[in-house]
A protein has these predicted regions:
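Loop-helix junctions at membrane interfaces
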Residues: 1-143
Length: 143
């Protein structure tokens, strides 16, 4: 079957993924040993959907889900982190073009997916989020 970034199936999966991301982001938090920090299961969901349905779906799932979660929890989204969530899922979604998403998933497919996931997280949380915090919110540059 030909892969399509904009099929009806992909759009429905995007809507369901965004809703699932929002609920998990708001209510399912795994405590971490780092103070004031939790592990978010929602990012795994966005990465999975991105790998199966493509980078556009991944970006929209994480972006919309995170924005709605922030809006409902805090009254307004923290846009720099919302964009970073979307970018991390978008980069994970680039694996969509390199892996087999139908049938048996090989060890190579899992390795490729994990490389994209690590790159996506590194770029989003080490570059995009801090830079946008500085640009959008005028946060001080602390090197």
């Amino acid at each position: 079957m030909k892969k399509s970034l904009f099929s009806t199936k992909t759009m429905v999966a995007t809507a369901l993924g965004a809703a699932l991301f929002m609920v998990l982001f708001m209510f399912v938090k795994v405590p971490s040993p780092v103070p004031e920090t939790n592990l978010q299961i929602a990012y795994g969901i966005s990465a999975f959907f991105a790998a199966v349905y493509g980078p556009v779906a991944g970006f929209l799932i994480a972006f919309i889900g995170h924005a709605l979660s922030d809006f409902l929890s805090y009254g307004s989204p923290w846009w720099s982190w919302v964009v970073a969530s979307g970018i991390s899922a978008l980069i994970c979604g680039l694996a969509y073009f390199k892996i087999n998403t139908e049938g048996k998933v090989s060890t190579k497919d899992l390795l490729v997916f994990n490389v994209f996931a690590i790159l996506g997280c590194a770029i989003a949380w080490v570059v995009v989020a801090p830079v946008l915090d500085i640009v959008i919110y005028g946060e001080p540059v602390n090197l």
